[in-house]
Amino acid sequence: MKRVSFVIFFMTIAAVVYGQEPAPAMLPLTLPDGKTLQVEVARTEETRALGLMFRTALTEDRGMLFIFEQPGLHRFWMKNTLIPLDMVWMDDRKRIIHIEYQVPPCKLDPCAVYGPSADSLYVLEVISGVASREQLRVGQTLTF
């Protein structure tokens, strides 16, 4: 009986641990003024596709950094995104090449698509207002 209880206990723990989503990778990202944000890293196709969808809140010291394998015309939409965002595109040197300020959630299809006309390798999403408040500008470099 003890052995059966132990096996059931072990299997229950294994099922709980196995079924949990891994915590997102967090990375400090430093803005040109020295302020540091903690950003979730979206490095895989799956995490990039999900992005910040279905989030109901995002604090000003948090964000999501999308990292792509290759530079390209990486465009974003706000489908299923519930909070307004600022989006910051960067090239392979982490230099800002384009900013979209105060992008609203998409309420009706088709959703607008946002992005630069030049290739980017990284995109930072933060809660709406952060890019203006931190005076982010094209040509500045972010550190991460």
Stretches with model-predicted labels:
Residues V4-S5, L50:
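Small/flexible residues
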Residues S5-A15:
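Bacterial N-terminal signal peptides
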